[in-house]
Amino acid sequence: MTTSRGNMDGGMCASTTRGLLAGGYVNPSPYARVNLIDFITIATTGNSTDFGDLTVTGQGPGANSNSLRGVFGGRNNPSKQQVIDFVEIATTGNAVDFGDMLNVFSDCAGTSDSHGGLAE
């Protein structure tokens, strides 16, 4: 990871070529939530690389993806957040605001297929 995170608590998603990790927090002290997105290239060994940033910092985002887009929803900063962000997995850059979750969540779980995703 580009920044050491003692306890990850981030959301992960992937395409067939890249894996992304977003959010989480730096621990030990000073305890700080982050908005970082890192990626790895699945077919090669090596360190992760900076992908970009989420729109807000936080730990515990749920994540979904298909082969093109990764979506991160909900997080804790320090209160629960409704924000949903998305990225285009094939290109690096900052996340874009997708909208808001109907309810406020953190420490979400997500799953998806090639057509849509669910978060809880």
Report the location of each language-model feature.
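Polar, enzyme-active/binding microenvironments
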Residues: M1-E120
